[in-house]
Amino acid sequence: MTKWLQTDDQVQNLSINEVGWVGVDKNAAEIQSLKQKLEQHNGITGLQVFEPDELEAIVDVFYRDGFVVVQNVLSADQLSVLKAACDEEVIKLLSKDKERSGNRGSHRYSFGSASRTGHMMHRPEWAMLLDLDTLTPIMSAIFGSSHYIARGGGGDFCLPGATKYQPLHSDMSNAVHHLHQGKTYTFGSFMDPRGILNYRDLPTPYVCCNFLVVDSNATNGPIRQIPGTQHSHHPMPKLDAEPDWMKHSTVNPAPAGSVIIRDVRAWHGGTPNLSNEVRAIPNVEFYAPWFRENLLTSVPRDIFESLSEHGQNVAKYIAAAEGQSLDIGYRNSLGGTPDGF
């Protein structure tokens, strides 16, 4: 759904943690009651947080649960520059949305959906995530090869005042063909013409790495992940039928500088941010060496040429050609909000 948005000429004058709670009374009784519930119940029991060199355990937990948390993936300097870039882009994006309508529900946004390239790889702070000394060995271990490729990178953020849950969802599907105005559009890439297998039966084809630029806690909108659902054929529960244990299956506590490595098929969703800080989780996304979907050009040539040899190999399918310029900026509609969000 696309909504007409009002611009916000004053957001530039606000600090990053003053941009939320627009049109929402954080002192309302129902908000305070929900906040208390989150403080009491949020957080996956026994959540393990690994160091980057614990490769065997990282891979085991990733394949068991469909996600894994690794701390100290970003150095202090890398964390600082990435957070500053996120803060800058949040302000730019909000300048188009005075009422904080969002593009993933009120006070909730996808960087990539808002971006005219579909990604944020035109920012060197995002591009550096393609080849981190701490992350590359993990991705090579998960895929069993260093020849995986980048899909791009964006991520999301939720503002203080995001009081609603995002429905559980998955970021993949079987191939779907849609006819529109005489043209056929294909979404997804895997289809078994025999009707025996579907994308959930495959080894991990597509991984998203979400980086924490602030500590993840019970009330600042931590992502919720339902362990072991990456291969599930059961229908995801609708939000109004979702049991409380799923709503509280949040990835917290986890420190800033960590990465949440996700098999995108696993059920996940956003949770309320009733804190006083913006929670952003910028990401990079990778495909297994054997998997492909349509790829969008999103890495400017000068940034591509600044990458390491491995970084260039990973990003070669999304890099601009020599002399090619990219249309960089945010859509006025911020990309619109998908149905159900």
Q: Language-model segments: what does each one mean?
A:
Residues 2-65, 71-189:
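Non-heme Fe(II)-dependent double-stranded beta-helix
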Residues 3-48, 231-243, 250, 259-261, ...:
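Non-heme Fe(II)/2-oxoglutarate
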Residues 69-71, 148-152, 208, 222-225, ...:
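A structural signal for short, well-ordered beta-strand segments and their strand-loop junctions
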Residues 74-76, 155-158, 173, 215-218, ...:
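Short, solvent-exposed loop/turn segments at secondary-structure junctions
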Residues 122-128, 196-198, 246-250, 269-271:
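Active-site rim elements
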Residues 153-155, 209-211, 282-286:
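A structural signal for short, well-ordered beta-strand segments
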Residues 164-251, 293-301:
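Catalytic core of non-heme Fe(II) oxygenases with the double-stranded beta-helix
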Residues 255-256:
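Residue-level recognition of short, solvent-exposed, well-ordered loop/turn junctions
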